[in-house]
Amino acid sequence: MTSSVQRLLELPRYASDGPHAIKPGFDRIESILEYMGRPDREMDIALVAGTNGKGSTASMMAACLTSAGYKTALQTSPHLLRINERMRVNGSEVPQDWLERAAGKHLTAFRDIGTSFYEATLALSLLWFAEVHATHAVVETGLGGRLDATNVLDASVSVITSVDLDHTELLADTIAATATEKAGIIKARKPVVLGNMYIEAAKVISDIALQREAPVWDFQPLAATYPSFQLALA
């Protein structure tokens, strides 16, 4: 018998169906979150985008929040072996029995609404986070930012780790245009954190942040120099 979790893989997904699985618009994710009772509004959310480094950055942010004593959720993609890997709270994956029950309960709604696999797993992640009373969630975007399903989330802070050319058939084919896509996650009057990136990209993002009255926190790599010295064994 095919499990409910395995049936989730039958929904349209980029990994198996390519670009055809990605449909623009927020109607589907908004509809499924409304149907679930808007679990995303039960926690403070940090949204992390970037061509490279967003997954590791999101993981480190979640680890820091957990260490500080917050019950912290982490949603990432893609998974390597199991869908459970996408959903963690305080470092622990979602239990398989919960995922089976939730997938079985909501699969018909996913199909009726036409949600993609990515949208469905995002919604299930947020539902579990709310049910276990996570106070904070770090959410990694999928592709781009502006049109990504995660952009319906009212994030308290946005993070853009880097900007480079990637998925040009879906997003953009210049650094400036790609930066504009990433900057789409910036929320009005809420801070955005920038990683190390091309000056051109940083300027585009900073200009968009200014338009939205969003504070910009620009972090550069730490550089350290050490005097020359020799080690000798006595």
Identify what each model region corresponds to.
Residues 48, 80, 144, 223-224:
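Positions that flank functional sites
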Residues 57-61, 122, 234:
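Short helix immediately C-terminal to the catalytic nucleophile in hydrolase catalytic domains
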Residues 19-26, 30-43, 67-153, 169-171:
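ATP-dependent carboxylate-amine ligase catalytic core
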Residues 1-52, 56-71, 80-81, 97, ...:
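N-terminal leader/targeting and accessory segments in enzymes
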Residues 61, 125, 205:
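Aromatic/hydrophobic pocket-lining residues that form π-stacking "cages" and hydrophobic walls in ligand
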Residues 120, 136-140, 155-234:
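Acidic, Mg2+-coordinating active-site environments of NTP-dependent enzymes
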Residues 10-14, 34-38, 104, 108-115, ...:
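Generic secondary-structure signature for well-ordered alpha-helical cores
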Residues 45-47, 72-74, 152, 158, ...:
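Conserved beta-strand scaffold positions in the cores of enzyme catalytic domains, especially
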